[in-house]
Structures are given as C-alpha cells and as structure tokens.
A protein has these predicted regions:
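Active-site helix of classical SDR
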Residues: 123, 159, 167
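C-terminal substrate-recognition "lid" of short-chain dehydrogenase/reductases
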Residues: 179, 213-242
Length: 247
C-alpha cells in the first residue's frame, strides 16, 4: 500500500543521513519528490538518479534554506516543475558543538540560521501554496536535545527547541485551513556521522536507551511517511520522539 501516492513533497537537506532516507521512503510510497542539498553536490545528484528508479517524479535543487530569498525561489521553482506542494519536511540542519564559554558568536549564529531560520523561511514560502489549496502537512525535524538540552550543544538545543515552539504556533495559525504542523524528535540514530565513532562509545550510549539499541534512519522516515499521509489527518501540533524511550 502506497501511502503518499499523488502527493508532492519537499525535503530539505536530503543528500545524506535521515533526510536521504526520508526522500527514499517518500518515493517508495508514491510521492513525487523535490529535495534540496547545498554542500554535498555529488550526493545530491546521485540521490536524484537513485530515486527515479521508484517511478515517481524527482528533482533536486541546490538551495540554501537559511536565506529567505533562496527559500522563496525554491518554492517558485517547485511550483513551476511540479505544479503544487502538499508536504514539506524541514530537515536541513548542522551541528557546531562546544561548551558555552568556548562557543563563538559565529558558531551560535550559523546553527540558529541553518537549523531554525531555515524552517521559518521555507514554511512561510510554502504556506502560501497550502493556504490556497486548503491542505498541507509540515513535518519539522527537531531532536530529543531540543526537549531536554545537552551540555556542549547549547546552540543546537536552542535551535531544536525553537522548532518545537514555532511548529506548535503554526499548527494553531493554519489549522483552520486544514494545514497540519508536527515535529519529529529523533534520539540516537545511526547515520554516517555515528559510523565513524568508537564502537564502544556507541554501545555505551545504546545501553542507556530502554530499547538497548540505536535507532535507524528508517525509524524516522517511517514516521514522516505517516505524518505526510492522510492517515494522520487529525494529528497536528505534536512532538513525536523517535528515541527508543530516551525521553
């Protein structure tokens, strides 16, 4: 059963990790997929080729979502190429970790701009389309760190907490237009970034999780498929952890 057949989806920051898996799952479930990448050009181009094997329309865009004019241009281009837009997954994000006393203003600003401002930029631009259509689903990627904080990640935690407050507000503002806004909060998920860590460190983290394992990108992507589908039509303004019971 394909849950997203006939829907047009945008996934930001989809060249690798969780974003890439979301793009794959959306195409697998029948969605036409627009996605963005920025620095990982080769991976972005490779993903576009890969997703075409699912038989849906796919196009990648090199775009910096942290810049408002680029976000507006992105939505304009998607409308020209796909005709409309039903689902937005705001996934673009970075980390620049460091203790508060060692954190530079630049590292604070970079993380807030890319992680939080990009969500505002893309959501504002895309909401015009959804308001006109009187339907739509925003799926915004936060983190368990945005709920509970984490030493050495004040900038990242602040950006992810901001996404939660923003998303709940948008759910209240746009609910009357049949537009939903939900938050996914991943915990410890196995990606390319975790693959380079010491296996003993990874195992130590996993043992602190009630399910005693790291999550997989599939775990996050499957939830996003549900939130983008009509099966979640009465769910909005929620923060849903994918964390094996960490929270």
């Amino acid at each position: 059963m394909k849950l997203l057949e006939g829907k047009i989806a945008l996934i930001t920051g989809a060249s690798k990790g969780i974003g890439r898996k979301i793009a794959e799952k959306f195409a697998e479930h029948g969605a036409d997929v627009a996605f963005t990448y920025l620095s990982s050009v080769e991976k972005g181009e490779a993903l576009e080729q890969e997703l075409q094997s699912f038989g849906t329309k796919v196009k990648g865009y090199r775009s910096d979502a942290s810049k408002f004019d680029e976000a507006e241009k992105l939505i304009e281009d998607i409308l020209a190429d796909f005709g409309t837009l039903d689902i937005v997954v705001n996934n673009a994000g970075i980390t620049k970790d460091g203790l508060l006393m060692r954190m530079s203003e630049e590292n604070w600003d970079d993380v807030l701009n890319i992680n939080l401002k990009s969500v505002f930029n893309v959501t504002k631009a895309a909401s015009k389309v959804m308001i006109k259509n009187r339907k739509g689903s925003f799926i915004n990627m936060s983190s368990v760190v945005g709920v509970q904080g984490n030493a050495g990640q004040a900038n990242y935690a602040a950006s992810k907490a901001g996404i939660i407050g923003f998303s709940k507000s948008i759910a209240k503002e746009l609910g009357s237009r049949n537009i939903r806004s939900n938050v996914v909060a991943p915990g410890f998920i196995r990606t390319e970034m975790t693959d380079v860590l010491d296996p003993k460190v990874v195992e130590g983290w996993a043992q602190a999780i009630p399910l005693k394992r790291a999550g997989e990108t599939d775990d996050v992507a499957n939830l996003c498929v549900f939130l983008g589908s009509d099966m979640s039509g009465y769910i909005t303004g929620q923060v849903i952890p994918v964390d094996g019971g960490m929270l």
